[in-house]
Regions:
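Long, compositionally biased intrinsically disordered regions
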Residues: 1-3, 215, 219-305, 312, ...
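A structural-propensity feature for long, helix-poor, extended segments
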Residues: 143-150, 376-408
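Low-complexity, highly charged intrinsically disordered N-terminal segments
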Residues: 14-75, 276, 457, 461, ...
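N-terminal catalytic cores of NTP/NDP-binding nucleotidyl/phosphoryl-transfer enzymes
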Residues: 89-122, 343
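Short acidic, glycine/serine/threonine-rich loops at helix termini
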Residues: 105-106, 143-149, 238-243
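A translation/RNA-centric and nucleic-acid-associated enzymatic feature enriched
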Residues: 269, 274-339, 345-356, 365-367, ...
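A glycine-rich helix N-cap at a beta->alpha junction
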Residues: 150-177
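Glycine-rich phosphate/pyrophosphate-binding loops
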Residues: 104-105, 118-142, 366
Length: 532
């Protein structure tokens, strides 16, 4: 398989926020909220800062090797694990919760983006080494967001009554979805390989985070991707000081709140800090910690601590404290020798809140890079787009705009009344002159009559256009069909579809193609047209 790539500015797709557009355009107002530009100069500055920070590399590598125990490691992963123990190595990181079967396509895209950036930097800076890392948000408890996939717009839901951190959940019940996938894709060229991979990873694993680790290693291990599960006692010992600050003096709350007040002058704030930005994580519980009447209360439970007992709990069991979105990035950047973070638009918004928090704790702030986005167009749809008289970038436009453009370009009839409106304005001007000569106060009355008349003509013009559109209903049907196929559930394809149909058809060649067309530091939306 192979694709032809075209690129479109993110701003022209209509699917990205003003904040994202302004960040990509390096608007002056936002410059205060991040540290480094998305450029090689920004990368080099991030490296210099990171070299001064005492990352515990030995601890990191020890934990990673323990997490990979029992998995037959790809040579590229082993090489990268060994490299992380050296001071001249740095990570390029993306993060996501362990959505079942990788969830949406963008999960795959963001991983391939960190791999592409690492490859690019390794070629450019031969005296340093760059490792792609997937930081698994396995402590997230939002099963509603993580427990399903879409196949052909059908929602396949994991039916389970488990609660708490999704990464810790057992995989019971997922075999039903695997069976459903097998029934549909077993006959595809790479269907048997796909089914065996899913069964091995999910049916044969103790929990979701282990299943996700195995799946990502199977898919991306040959590229050297290192997967980190931060739900770990040893790693969290490094954070005890910051966690204590959060529990007692609420420094993260106060710092982030001040920054957000500045940010919200122009943009909606993505996440508001709480006085305590930690969850209590134990067994099947992940609940918010609140402070009430001088005691700490674990929300929705009978668990509570005195200040003294909470201090002991943190000292003895740091693994029971789970950072929320405000502290998650700080935890990530404390334990990894990281220089760049790749995330989606929502993640960019989170990270723009963090900079003062990083400054306060003297943790290096990474280069923020918007993850790559793709629209995949199969060869059959490419042909239909051309027959409808559209170019591939046109498909981002709303249906009505596409229809109007087609009608205006393909009709022999006059559809606008611009000439008539100009003539009418002249007509009313002459009446205004006549009446004004008699009584100046009549001019205002004539102006109102003109406004009303022009509005009536504008309404008529719209009716003429609507009537002409009805003469091209077949074109409308084709445009709707194209938009429905490329933008499932009226959303970007990457936010709905899963990688499974593509992998069943093309296997790892699909991943190779996405990687080949992935941009490194350039920031454009990529359209991939499947070639005949």
């Amino acid at each position: 398989m192979n694709f032809t790539a075209k690129s479109v500015p993110y701003q022209e797709t209509g699917y990205f926020s003003k904040l994202v557009s302004d960040y990509l355009n390096e608007k002056d107002f936002l410059r205060h909220f991040y540290e480094h530009p998305v450029s090689y100069e920004g990368i080099e500055a991030a490296i210099r800062e990171r070299e001064l920070f005492p990352t515990d590399r030995h601890l990191l590598v020890k934990v990673l090797k323990e997490q990979y125990a029992g998995i037959s490691l790809e040579d590229a992963v082993m090489k990268n694990l060994e490299a992380l123990d050296r001071n001249n190595s740095f990570t390029i990181t993306t993060a996501h919760q362990p959505a079942i079967f990788t969830g949406n396509l963008y999960f795959i895209y963001k991983i391939l983006h960190v791999i592409r950036i690492s490859q690019t930097l390794n070629a450019r800076y031969t005296d340093r080494f760059f490792v792609p890392v997937f930081y698994m948000g396995s402590e997230d408890a939002d099963l509603d967001e993580l427990g399903y996939i879409y196949l052909d717009n059908e929602k396949l839901l994991w039916e389970t009554q488990q609660t708490g951190a999704v990464g810790r959940m057992q995989t019971n019940g997922l075999e039903k979805i695997v069976d459903r996938i097998e029934g549909e894709f077993a006959g595809d060229p790479h269907g048997p390989e796909l089914i065996q991979m899913l069964k091995s990873c999910y049916v044969g694993s103790e929990n979701i985070q282990q299943a996700t680790l195995k799946l990502l290693h199977h898919l991306f291990g040959r590229y050297g991707l290192v997967v980190l599960i931060p739900d770990n006692r040893l790693l969290k010992t490094v954070m005890r000081g910051i966690f204590k600050d959060d529990l007692t003096i609420h420094a993260p709350y106060e710092i982030t709140e001040r920054n957000n007040r500045l940010l919200e002058e122009l943009y909606p704030v993505q996440a508001n800090p709480r006085e305590i930005n930690l969850f209590y994580l134990k067994d099947n519980i992940r609940e918010r910690i609140d402070r009430k009447d001088g005691k700490y209360q674990v929300n929705n439970t009978a668990i509570h601590f005195s200040p003294e007992d909470m201090e002991k709990e943190l000292a003895n069991f740091p693994e029971r404290f789970s950072p929320n979105v405000i502290l998650r990035g700080l935890y990530q950047e404390t334990i990894l020798p990281n220089i760049a973070f790749i995330g989606g638009g929502g993640e960019m918004a989170y990270w723009l809140e963090y900079k003062p928090l990083f400054k306060h704790y003297r943790v290096p702030y990474p280069v923020l890079i918007l993850r790559n986005s793709f629209l995949l167009i199969r060869k059959g749809w490419k042909s239909k787009i051309e027959k409808a008289g559209l170019s591939t970038p046109d498909v981002f436009k709303p249906e009505e705009e596409l229809m109007e453009n087609f009608v205006r370009s393909n009709t022999t009839r006059q559809l606008n009344l611009d000439k008539q409106m100009t003539e009418m304005s002249g007509f009313y001007q002459s009446i205004k002159n006549i009446s004004g000569a008699v009584d100046k106060t009549l001019e205002q009355h004539v102006e109102k009559l003109e406004t009303q008349a022009l509005q009536k003509l504008e309404e008529l013009e719209k009716k003429i256009l609507r009537a002409e559109k009805k003469n091209h209903e077949e074109v409308r049907r084709k445009i709707h069909e194209i938009r429905e196929a490329l933008f499932p559930l009226e959303n970007l394809q990457e936010r709905v579809d899963n990688f499974i149909p593509w992998y069943a058809e093309y296997g790892k060649a699909f991943l190779d193609q996405i990687l080949q067309h992935s941009l490194a530091l350039d920031q454009m939306f990529i359209i991939l047209e499947e070639n005949q």
